[in-house]
């Protein structure tokens, strides 16, 4: 693994930095306050080619890999965009683009990938009220009827479902009690949205208010058989393949948010004087920021390794989960101590740190909880007994 970025990768970083300049913290402050989708930001991501980075050139994409996607996400996030720098790319490019690219047939690729490159928004219909971390407990049922499937069920906490033109929907095609093994019986479908059989209800939430997260109610949704992604009953393995790049994306977001907060805290700590000296000269403020910076850089390297392995088709679950554990804790530490550096201003909306605090804490809960990532490391890296 060469740590020197190629000329092409450096161009990705530069282009992401240029895009971020047009969307400063005030822009995001207003979008979050007014619960407005950032239409012009999404258009900028599409026009710059970031949405199609991982999609082959023959479909209109950049023909690059997850490593380059991570660079774009991290740069957009750390330059000024906060979690939005990763959020929309993960929803569409990872959930939609990578899933279709890796597991779709040629007709599905021809149908969806060019449209994704042009800005077709996607969402992932995975989580259910009784199936969060326990994905195998999914109850949304898809019943085969002739040349189509009829789907009924409920999903929750589905981000982007209100705007998505496509949903990767995780269903159960064989009841759990009838499946030959627990990991069989799930199937994935590509669903065109919006759809009269799919009711979408936004959930009021703590942050990221420029993107809606929704309850989704599915009633007699009819999906053609040709919209089945991969093999029937083997969707669990496709879900697993999506989870690693999802974790890498959120690691990039946590690291990027941490870097953004540290940068702003350092600027303030150099200018703000208390007792006749810049507050940055006091170890109580300086050392926590320095420690967070060191941890973030370590997390970035581990995340790069995970993406490098993924792009070569090598096992990367250990690296992806460890990167998320380290990046999230470092990012939260960085934003927390940035807030302490700003003092009372850190709690004020106009200084943005409180928004980054609301955003970075999501990375500890999603796309997998901190505890589930640690469980993976304990069981699959250390070889300890299953802990749940």
Segments predicted by a language model, with ranges:
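Short glycine/proline-enriched turns and hinge-like loops at secondary-structure junctions
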Residues: 64, 134-136, 160-165, 180-184, ...
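Helix-loop "lid/cap" segments that line or gate small-molecule binding pockets
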Residues: 93-103
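A short, Trp-centered hydrophobic/proline-enriched beta-strand micro-motif
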Residues: 118-127, 170
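Short Ser/Thr-interspersed hydrophobic loop/turn segments at strand-loop and sheet-helix junctions
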Residues: 49, 72-77, 171-173, 191-196, ...
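Alpha-helical interface subdomain recognition
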Residues: 1-83, 90, 103-108, 115-119, ...
